[in-house]
Amino acid sequence: MNRDTICVQGGYTPGNGEPRQIPIIQSTTFKYATSEDMGKLFDLEADGYFYSRLQNPTCDMVAKKICELEGGTAAMLTSSGQAANFFALFNICEAGDHIVASSTIYGGTFNLISVTMAKMGITATFVDPLCTEEELNAAFRPNTKVVFGETIANPALTVLDIEKFAKAAHAHGVPLMVDNTFPTPVNCRPFEWGADIVTHSTTKYMDGHGAVLGGAIVDGGKFDWMAHAEKFPGLCTPDDSYHGITYAKRFGKEGAFITKATAQLMRDFGSVQSPMDAYMLNLGLESLHVRMQRHCANGMAVAQFLENHPKVAYVNYCGLESSPYHALAQKYLPNGSCGVVSFGLAGGRQAASTFMKELKLAAIETHVADARTCCLNPASSTHRQMNDEQLAAAGVPAELVRMSCGLESAEDLIADIAQALDKV
């Protein structure tokens, strides 16, 4: 089925006389006739629901739609994009393990991996996304368990060479995990290029209206956990906290990852999305394919205007032919990338501050990928916790402005940018 149709009708097919829109099952619990019936659910021997901290029908319908959009085999929703990335990483990493990650990932995820997970005994090596294959392979250690990157990095807007990173990951017997938030599956399906796990902050383009926090994890169902059983004991040996289930044996490579993340991590951490929020997310998904066209068109128009403005020192947007990532964008993102543009002003950080203050349509806010245009200075906000060396490695200089182009008229956006630049 075409992704446009999946956006509208995926995940839920109503039966005769059933609601056309997905139903909101706003209930914490579910009734069963016998304790034996419920016991089968607790033993993962039957399909169904017993407590919404783990699974809920509304959430599952929306997760199924996202799974279909990505071309995966199983998916789950979380309370935020950060929860999705943490669950996905912690689902296969434990104390003593190691992660290889792109250096240009979102500041919050960088902090999650480099600081919070380090407190759990999980270390990381960060690599330039444009590194050579030799440099990438040199980052691996015997205890490396996963490679992580973003299809389009936030806010440096670097493009991940998915095939290169997948090749290296698989050569070392580990999966490639890709955060596909910015392009969404409308513009890129990482599984088609070798990725194994995909994550999303559904708060961004999928919701698209700045209304609902959420995240998603999708399994491509191709990584053979049992073939590398010694690396992944959590999936390939009995889980003492769940009746001795061995997830990879019971559910195979198509379902083991999401089943473990749901039955074990969601049980223990509870970062679940509410049914009402899942319902609202679905409303956003229904128009995702249409909105992404406008976001991409506006992003390109703004990037082209900025590239030719004398007060702009540089522009990061992979759709521009001048971008060092243009060839990768043509390969992985032929139909467009996203509506986010980042750029630096010739006058430095103070010029960036003045520029943002003078904007009329674009609001200064810590958000991105909204219907309304917004901007911020990452070095003083989303990446504020990084030191100068880390900022440089992440592609986030002090003067950088990140602008998320919304659904307004491109002509109006450019006029607003022009008048603000005139005052710098």
Language-model segments: residues:
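Conserved N-terminal alpha-helix of the aminotransferase class I/II PLP-enzyme fold
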Residues: 34-86, 108-116
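Glycine-centered tight turns that cap/initiate beta-strands
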Residues: 71, 143, 311-314, 399
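N-terminal "arm"/small-domain region of PLP-dependent enzymes with the aminotransferase-like
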Residues: 1-56, 64
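Short loop segments at secondary-structure junctions
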Residues: 29, 220-223, 345-348
